[in-house]
């Protein structure tokens, strides 16, 4: 068996006039994340981790922020397409672990829905998807509430050829 671990990262600026979508969940808040797509920072980090684990590059290589097809794109659809490309490369996704770093809003009430979305999109049992939420203890741009960051790790495996 060929086990691979991928690491993903994303950050987006918080701005007025946009919805806040994290993990495919719309979260009530006065600001949202700025981006070409729906700017779902968590799903972008997970997508990057999966592409990285399969040595398929990164999210920008597959879903460029200069491509008008992805303007306002639903990041859940992008994650599903990522999973299909990882599978096409011969890998199965085993688990995902992720962390969201945001001073506000409180994300704990939304974690279960995020996990359910990610598990559904990746075709995984819920117990193979983890999402954690942390603050930056009021330090730096994250602590000042200027943006939200996400980090993710993913394990994929390719069965040995017979």
Curated annotation (Swiss-Prot):
Instruction: State its Enzyme Commission number(s).
Output: 4.6.1.12
What biological processes does GO assign it? isopentenyl diphosphate biosynthetic process, methylerythritol 4-phosphate pathway; terpenoid biosynthetic process
Which cofactors are reported in the record for this sequence? a divalent metal cation
Q: How is the cofactor bound?
A: Binds 1 divalent metal cation per subunit.
Pathway-wise, it operates in:
Isoprenoid biosynthesis; isopentenyl diphosphate biosynthesis via DXP pathway; isopentenyl diphosphate from 1-deoxy-D-xylulose 5-phosphate: step 4/6
Q: Which Gene3D superfamilies match?
A: 2-C-methyl-D-erythritol 2,4-cyclodiphosphate synthase (3.30.1330.50)
Instruction: Please provide, alphabetically and separated by semicolons, the GO molecular function terms listed in this UniProt record.
Output: 2-C-methyl-D-erythritol 2,4-cyclodiphosphate synthase activity; metal ion binding
Q: Could you confirm whether the keyword Lyase appears in this record?
A: yes
**Subunit structure as annotated in this protein's UniProt entry:** Homotrimer.
**Its function?**
Involved in the biosynthesis of isopentenyl diphosphate (IPP) and dimethylallyl diphosphate (DMAPP), two major building blocks of isoprenoid compounds. Catalyzes the conversion of 4-diphosphocytidyl-2-C-methyl-D-erythritol 2-phosphate (CDP-ME2P) to 2-C-methyl-D-erythritol 2,4-cyclodiphosphate (ME-CPP) with a corresponding release of cytidine 5-monophosphate (CMP).
Write down what this protein is called. 2-C-methyl-D-erythritol 2,4-cyclodiphosphate synthase
Species source reads Burkholderia thailandensis (strain ATCC 700388 / DSM 13276 / CCUG 48851 / CIP 106301 / E264)
Q: Which gene encodes it?
A: ispF
């Amino acid at each position: 068996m060929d086990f691979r671990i991928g690491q993903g990262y994303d950050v987006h600026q918080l701005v007025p006039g946009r919805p806040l979508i994290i993990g495919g969940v719309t979260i009530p808040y006065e600001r949202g994340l700025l981006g070409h797509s729906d700017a779902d920072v968590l799903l972008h980090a997970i997508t990057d981790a999966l592409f990285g684990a399969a040595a398929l590059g990164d999210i920008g290589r597959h879903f460029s922020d200069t491509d008008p097809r992805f303007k306002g794109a639903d990041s859940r659809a992008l994650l599903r397409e990522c999973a299909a490309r990882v599978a096409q490369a011969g890998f199965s996704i085993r688990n995902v672990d992720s962390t969201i770093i945001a001073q506000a809003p409180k994300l704990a009430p939304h974690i279960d829905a995020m996990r359910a979305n990610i598990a559904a999109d990746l075709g995984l049992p819920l117990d193979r998807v983890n999402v954690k939420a942390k603050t930056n203890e009021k330090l730096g741009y994250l602590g000042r509430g200027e943006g939200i960051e996400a980090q993710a790790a993913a394990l994929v495996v390719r069965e040995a050829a017979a």
